[in-house]
Amino acid sequence: MTLKIVRRAAGADCMSILAQLPEWFGIPESNAEYAEAAEREQAWVAEESGEALGLMVLVDQGLSAIDVHLLAVRPNLHRQGVGRALIERACAVARELAKPYVTVKTRGPSLPYEPYEHTRAFYEAVGFEPLEELTAIWGPENPCLIMIMRVSG
């Protein structure tokens, strides 16, 4: 696979990929918010031969961190390096902006759901560590696990 992180993402890229991932992104209102975020924040597309394979939206969290607000990869391309390449871009952006950390929020382990078990395993494999699980962010029916990775300093 000749993968390149070549361009900024747009809302249409976001909606196209999220539509293929209903196990993770099945709430239309949330997907619309992700598409809006792709337009206003730093958003990147991984592509091959002009086809969008995955995308990532980054949000500056202030003094110390860049947050991976969204990471989505076409389901047929999981475990092929697309997500890892996007996380590497997030780390590069954090270093460029002198941010020592990259964070990500995902569904916490206290409410088991197999797709998110794979998500957490991916984030741990690329270097994130669990920091804290909270119910105050997304509600008790959707516990939020905050994960963190040091990229510099």
Can you name each region flagged by the protein language model?
Residues 94-115:
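Conserved GNAT acetyl-CoA-binding A-motif
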Residues 123, 128:
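Conserved active-site tyrosine of GNAT-family acetyltransferases
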Residues 41, 142-146:
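Short hydrophobic/aromatic beta-strand or adjacent loop that forms the aromatic wall/cage
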Residues 71-79, 108-110:
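A short, internal acetyl-CoA/4′-phosphopantetheine-binding micro-motif in the GNAT/acyltransferase core
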Residues 5-70, 74, 87-88, 93, ...:
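Acetyl-CoA-dependent GNAT
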Residues 116-119, 133-143:
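Short glycine/proline-centered loop/turn elements that form peptide/ligand docking sites
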Residues 120-122, 150:
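Short, hinge-like loop/turn segments at secondary-structure boundaries
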